[in-house]
Regions:
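Conserved small/polar residues in nucleotide/adenosyl-binding loops
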Residues: 220-222
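N-proximal low-complexity "stem/linker" segments adjacent to membrane-targeting elements
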Residues: 1-31
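A short, conserved alpha-helix in the catalytic core of glycosyltransferases
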Residues: 77, 139-155, 160-188
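Short aromatic/hydrophobic "clamp" motif used to bind/position activated sugar donors
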Residues: 59
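Glycine-rich, basic loop-to-helix element that forms the pyrophosphate-binding segment
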Residues: 40-54
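A recurrent flexible, glycine/aromatic-enriched loop bordering the glycosyltransferase active site
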Residues: 123-148
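Conserved donor NDP-sugar-binding/catalytic core segment of glycosyltransferases
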Residues: 40, 72-113
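Active-site donor/metal-binding and catalytic loop motifs
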Residues: 183-204, 208
Length: 222
């Protein structure tokens, strides 16, 4: 298999962004699934629909506000999974210790590197050194760019979580607890046109997540 599926949930499909994504992944036979969602469905629902529609083993979930620095992404992503068959989920940033629903709470446990754009400012958040060709095992990854091998994971997105928050933590944690490796790579460079947002909906999901997994949180570390 030399193609992958890319899934993006967005309020309104922007053809310029679609073209940027296609150019960055650099494979005309990839499957691109852009789903318009004004909030009628949770991100967990939309992403599970993407998995259901996918015709490839590897499914990449992306935010709709990314600027890709790395090009020709498709073969790079396939190579990551081919060389690391024990991994089912790979991202660009994460943590190897989880003590609450705020995964970035322990700065010293964070791994990976992600670029950000905030107004006119463009910078890279280096949570750790580069790993080169290696993958660093973590417990949780940030969902801005999630690569999933659907035949290796044992759990899909948890639809008990509503809205646009906490779609990433439960799927990573459940798979980690079931022996599926979750990892971070520094081989892919991009910029996120957002610095994240924690609002009342985020807090509601955070408390729900912590209630569900309270017995695991203090024990989860690699």
């Amino acid at each position: 298999m030399n193609t992958i599926t890319i899934v993006c949930s967005t309020r309104k499909i922007d053809e310029n962004y679609v073209n940027h994504v296609k150019k960055s992944f650099s494979h005309p036979k990839n499957q691109y699934i852009f789903i318009e969602n004004n909030g009628d469905k949770s991100l967990t629902q939309v992403y599970n629909e993407g998995i259901g529609q996918s015709t490839n083993d590897i499914v990449v979930f992306i935010h709709d506000d990314l600027e890709f620095e790395t090009k020709n992404l498709t073969p790079k992503i396939i190579k990551l999974f081919d060389k690391n068959p024990e991994y089912g989920i790979i991202g660009l940033a994460g943590t190897n210790s989880l003590i609450s629903g705020q995964w970035w709470e322990k700065r010293e446990s964070m791994q990976g590197q992600v670029g950000h754009i905030n107004g006119n400012k463009k910078y890279i958040s280096k949570y750790s050194d580069s790993f080169g060709d290696k993958i660093k095992e973590v417990v949780i990854i940030d969902g801005l760019f999630m690569m999933i091998h659907k035949n290796r994971v044992k759990h899909n997105f948890d639809t008990r979580f509503e809205g646009f928050h906490f779609y990433d933590l439960p799927i990573c944690l459940l798979n980690h607890l079931d022996g599926v490796k979750v990892g971070v790579t520094t081989k892919i460079k991009l910029y996120h046109k957002s610095i994240g947002m924690t609002d009342k909906k985020w807090l509601k999901n955070k408390l729900f997540f912590e209630a569900l997994y309270e017995k695991h949180l203090s024990l989860i570390h690699i």
